[in-house]
Each structure stands twice: as structure tokens, then as C-alpha cells.
Amino acid sequence: MTNLSLDGRFARELPEMAVRWKAEEAPDPRLLVLNDELASGLGLDADWLRSPDGVRLLVGNSVPDGATPVAQAYAGHQFGGFAPRLGDGRALLLGELVDGDGRMRDVHLKGSGHTPFARAGDGLAAVGPMLREYLVSEAMHALGIPTTRSLAVVATGRPVRRESVLDGAVLTRVASSHLRVGSFQYAAVTGDTDLVRRLAGHAIARHHPEVAGAADPYLGLFEAVCSAQAQLIARWMLVGFVHGVMNTDNMTISGETIDYGPCAFMDVYDPETVFSSIDSWGRYAYGNQPSIAAWNLARFAETLLPLFDDDIDRAITLAQNALGAFGRHYEGALTAGMQAKLGLTGVDGPAVAPLLDELLKLLQDNHIDFTSFFRALGLAARGDNEPVRGLFVDLAGFDAWLDSWRALGPDGAAMDRVNPVYIPRNHLVEEALTAAAAGDMEPFETLLDAVTGPFDERPGLQRYAEPAPEAFGRYRTFCGT
């Protein structure tokens, strides 16, 4: 593995947005989990990554010759308030490599130590939050949702002081890039239009090369990002995923999910579901995610206005027209996805829409577990109504809905291909992380195995398909910084 090479394209093309930096030395690095499948796809030798030299690479203490680790600069709106200088406070971009499919991928560290962007933070991360991101990001990938990936989590042997002293860790993350709406906001706030233009060109080359030859490639970039984000948010909604911190610095240009700090999956269906301990007003609630995405994209458009047209009024009109397509793309993706969840892919949309509206009201009024419902409904498509009927208190209302739905000829087998049995249920995640913090990785490994094969029911994993017991109570998440 001595021939591993990492490019420094971002640092080379956008030096104004990259600060060369080194990871802090990990005093006693110990590999906790390694993603063999991802390593293989990246052309990396998993056995070598498990070696002492490989583990040192995974925490950034040994980098290939020619690699240029950098902390990336970005700005962002955080809960609606603008911060002009955020950046990688506890992260480093080690560099880029080309995977087995010919795609350029970032190799990135999280929790690698204090950088010039750290502000008052220590730049470190604890084992629990890094394992959480590994678990949830790999579950999202298995669900078919665009996401950053997790290559490894390594315990550093360094204590991390939070409310108590915790074991430190580094997550090795892989992404199509770490370009964010906040990256463009940082470039724009400098007042350097050429920097914004070069950043846009970099984004086009990496993510949307098809627009490079368009009459207006920068407008094409914006339209492509709007479309990618519409598809992404729809996929979140279809599985009950609540991101929890949809700041503009956490919206990617690639259309991948990033930053799994306070995220969680909705249990009982409720559009007002919020898990994050710092989201006291519910800004990033489950049902608000589409509108927040549109708001973030409007902030992205603002950074690109000088590239759209020299005439500001015309530039604004172009941006508004392009942003207007986000809602149409989102509704189209959500409708198609819901039809698939109901086994009604071949049925005309107008016949399904009122049925779906009625169903969502029934789910909310009856406090029904979102994931369990759709999986049980697949059994009803095959004639076994009792599992899904057993979820409801208002049986008369649900039975009437069930008759209308079955009259449309749902496909139960198709439903099972899109409705998961296993998701990272909150009580199971906490159970696994608590055990891992005590040195027992077995619950984490079992849960990881379940959620990375989410659609196939397997013997011995029944408890991983069940909602949280009532005693688990109301769930709150924390960002882990």
C-alpha cells in the first residue's frame, strides 16, 4: 500500500479556501470498525488498513508522499443566522482519489484535532458520535439514499472532555466532495467574484460536467443542485429520516447527505417530529425539511447571482425561475416514492393522492410507527390484513382506507423492495453506543449488520424491527461537538 496516492485538487485549485494543516498525533490508535466493502471499492487493501501503518493513515498521522491535508473554509446560516467564517474546525481533507468506478472521492477525517477554524472548540470527537455517523451513514447508503460514506472509526487513546471525560476517536469519511452551499457563501462574502467563478467551475467539473458546455453553465449548476437536493429530501421523507441540523454548511453540492450529529429516524408518524436538543423551535422538524431545503437553495442562488447575469434584476429572475423547479422536482420524487411504498407504481397519480392524504392523517391520529406500518402493509397486499390492522385503534376508519387501497391492486413484493424492515431505531442506536463506550462492540456490529441489509427479514433479528418500548421515552439527540 506504499503506492497509495492522494491528489490535492481542491487545495491546488482553490488555495484561498484551504489551510494546510496536520492531524494531531493519536497517542494510542486502535481500529474499532473498518468498512471492507468501501475499502475495496476505493482500491484500498483492507488488510493493510488494519495494520499499524494503515491505522496511522486512517487518523491522519501518516499520509502518502505528495498529499496535502487541508482544513476547508466555508460559511453558513446556522438556524437562520449567518456566520461568515466556519470551516473545518475538527476535520481535514486528506486528499482525493479515484475509485474503482472512475469517480473522484474525498478522503476526509473528522475529529482529527484543532484547526484554525476551530474557534473555541477542541477539534476532537468522541467514540460515540463517530460510531453513530458510521452506523447511520452506512444504513442510509443501504437504503439507497445518497450520502457520505464511512470508511473507519479509530479510537485515538486521547481523552475528550465534554460533560464527562470520553474516549476520543477519528472517523475516516469518504464523499463525492465536501463542497457545500456554505462553501459558496464563504467565497461570495469575500467579494471576489473570480473566486466564486472558480469554485463554481470546480463544482461543475466534479459533479455536473454535463452543464459545462451549456449556454449558461452556472445557471445549469444551480438547476442541477436544486434537482439533486429535491431527490435527496424526498428520499429522507420516505424513510422518516430527520437530519436535525439543516444549516447551509450541511447542504452539499453533490446532493449527498452529510453530518449525522443530531439526526434520528422518526418512530410514530408526526410531521412536527424533532429530535435535536438545540432545535427548540422545531425549525428542522421532519415536516419542515422540504421548505428548509428550498430556503437553503435560495441562499445558494444569492452567491451565484453575479455569474448568472451582469444585470442584477435579470439575474434574480433567472434564479427565481430555477428555484421554482425545486418544488416540482420534490413533489414528483415524493409522489413516485410514496406510490412505490404503497405498491401502486403503475396507478395514475390522481387516484393515489387522496388515498395518501387520508392515510397520513390516519397514521398521525392513531400514533402509528411509520416504518412498521409500511412493512406490515406489504403483508396486507398478499391478503394477510391482521398485522397492519393490529396497529390501529380506529379500525373502522382504517378498514375503509384498506378496502380502497386494495381495490387498486397493490404489489406486495414490490413494496418489500422499498419498505425497510430494519432502520437505525433510536433505542437500538443508544444501546449499541453505550456498549461500545464500555468496550463491547458486539451490539454495534449486530445492529450494523441489520441496517445494512434493511429490506430482507432475517431470523434472530426480530427486536431490530420493533419500535422502542414505551419506557424508552422521548428521544433527544446531541451534536457531539
Swiss-Prot record:
The active site is at D249 (proton acceptor). One of its GO terms (molecular function) is AMPylase activity. The keyword Lipoprotein does not apply. Its EC number is 2.7.7.-, 2.7.7.108. InterPro entries: SelO (IPR003846). It catalyses: L-seryl-[protein] + ATP = 3-O-(5'-adenylyl)-L-seryl-[protein] + diphosphate; L-threonyl-[protein] + ATP = 3-O-(5'-adenylyl)-L-threonyl-[protein] + diphosphate; L-tyrosyl-[protein] + ATP = O-(5'-adenylyl)-L-tyrosyl-[protein] + diphosphate; L-histidyl-[protein] + UTP = N(tele)-(5'-uridylyl)-L-histidyl-[protein] + diphosphate. Belongs to the SELO family. NCBIfam families: PRK00029.1 (NF000658). This is Protein nucleotidyltransferase YdiU. It comes from Mycobacterium sp. (strain KMS).
